[in-house]
């Protein structure tokens, strides 16, 4: 549960009053700058959001008649409001301090500029309040691409990850990957604290990757871009040999590119994953070798067809 207290500690904010409300839960990632509310319009006041008061809001408030000030601040401070933050180290009005104290609404000050603080708070809240799920697999950073390796138990996911680590890539999580949907089409993965930096190898046991290979071999968190699904080779199954078939893996409401790699003796899966990651980066840059080959093949078929028609005439 994310509370106002954790926000104060994270951004080193100063609490002026309303300490009793520091345990309030923050449920909304949106942040408000109550400009219209300062003017007296509270019909659509989003009171469950964190409220930011900067130079603009307080300058307007100071222009209000004395008889309106107290009522305006009482309407602003609601029991469900997680916090009111005054930015730029500005002095909170006395009416605001009194209203916050009455309603046990945390009144906080910050030295940071309003826009900058709003951006930092939004990023933090989106990360902390994001939808989460867990998947069985291994997450590795390969050439800057977050690769989620999945497959049946015993297929060789951890062994493949170990080979990738030896080749200079970085482990994020093994066995259990905690995934957050930060925003639309953006997933990040990390390891649970209990198994952070650990890798399980059958017959060998649990190893500490950071201790064995150094700090450069691990990564705390990585955005998921590519799913490599390992499965035993089936003779009757037709595998993609050109690269035109586009598979996706849906996690929460986001889809990522998926490649199914058949596993059998003699195949170096780690190298295949390296190439898959590099090829994915090329695709993002607009270079698709499979499509180029397909266009070249179609052009050759068309040329041969026209040549045959000419000979028949």
UniProtKB/Swiss-Prot annotation:
Looking at the UniProt entry, the stretches that span the membrane are none
Which sites bind ATP?
A: 151-158
Looking up InterPro entries in the UniProt record yields: HPr(Ser)_kin/Pase (IPR003755), Hpr_kin/Pase_C (IPR011104), Hpr_kin/Pase_Hpr_N (IPR011126), P-loop_NTPase (IPR027417), Ser_kin/Pase_Hpr-like_N_sf (IPR028979)
Give disulfide pairs as residue numbers.
none
Provide the GO biological process annotations: regulation of carbohydrate metabolic process
- Where are the annotated segments for Important for the catalytic mechanism of both phosphorylation and dephosphorylation? 199-208
The cofactors required by this protein are:
Mg(2+)
Q: Which reaction does it catalyse?
A: [HPr protein]-L-serine + ATP = [HPr protein]-O-phospho-L-serine + ADP + H(+); [HPr protein]-O-phospho-L-serine + phosphate + H(+) = [HPr protein]-L-serine + diphosphate
Q: What function does the entry list?
A: Catalyzes the ATP- as well as the pyrophosphate-dependent phosphorylation of a specific serine residue in HPr, a phosphocarrier protein of the phosphoenolpyruvate-dependent sugar phosphotransferase system (PTS). HprK/P also catalyzes the pyrophosphate-producing, inorganic phosphate-dependent dephosphorylation (phosphorolysis) of seryl-phosphorylated HPr (P-Ser-HPr).
Domain remark in the UniProt entry: The Walker A ATP-binding motif also binds Pi and PPi.
Q: What is the official name of this protein in its record? A: HPr kinase/phosphorylase
Which organism is this entry from? Staphylococcus saprophyticus subsp. saprophyticus (strain ATCC 15305 / DSM 20229 / NCIMB 8711 / NCTC 7292 / S-41)
Q: Which gene encodes it?
A: hprK
